[in-house]
């Protein structure tokens, strides 16, 4: 399975339009090579470099396996989980200092998950255990210019 974006290269700098310094839009994501036996997809974006521990920016699960693209500034079909701000939906990079890494992690599962909207990443990851068929990752970096 592959996860790419026309907005930035893997390990490359994310443009400011996808951050708190710009329009705070989610980037366009392209999904390919989904296993044919997958029943749902999960997308998690997090920042392991946050001073308070890993910060969850975007959590979505039960995304249909027919999803090949998530358009810029949109939420994929599926169930929205809760990010570290306590909200659902995308929250862009806004690092307090230095360069941070932002991991977009895509998982193909062998089932749909019976979890409610607003589920935390921790609870989602617990429910995903033993259900992951494939995974892909895209990493972007960002540093605020102050």
Regions found by a protein language model. Name each.
Residues 1-146:
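N-terminus-centered regions that define maturation/targeting leaders and the start
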């Amino acid at each position: 399975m592959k996860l790419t974006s026309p907005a930035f290269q893997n390990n490359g700098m994310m443009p400011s339009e996808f951050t708190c310094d710009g329009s705070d839009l989610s980037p366009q994501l392209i999904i390919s090579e989904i296993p044919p036996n997958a029943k749902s997809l999960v997308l998690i974006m997090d920042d392991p470099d946050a001073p308070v521990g890993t910060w969850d920016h975007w959590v979505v699960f039960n995304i249909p396996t027919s999803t090949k693209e998530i358009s810029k500034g949109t939420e994929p079909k599926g169930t929205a989980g809760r990010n570290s701000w306590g909200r659902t939906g995308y929250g862009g990079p806004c690092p307090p200092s230095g360069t941070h890494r932002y991991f977009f992690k895509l998982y193909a599962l062998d089932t749909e998950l019976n979890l409610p909207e607003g589920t935390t990443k921790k609870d989602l990851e617990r429910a995903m255990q033993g259900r992951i068929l494939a995974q892909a990752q895209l990493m972007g970096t960002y540093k605020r210019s102050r």
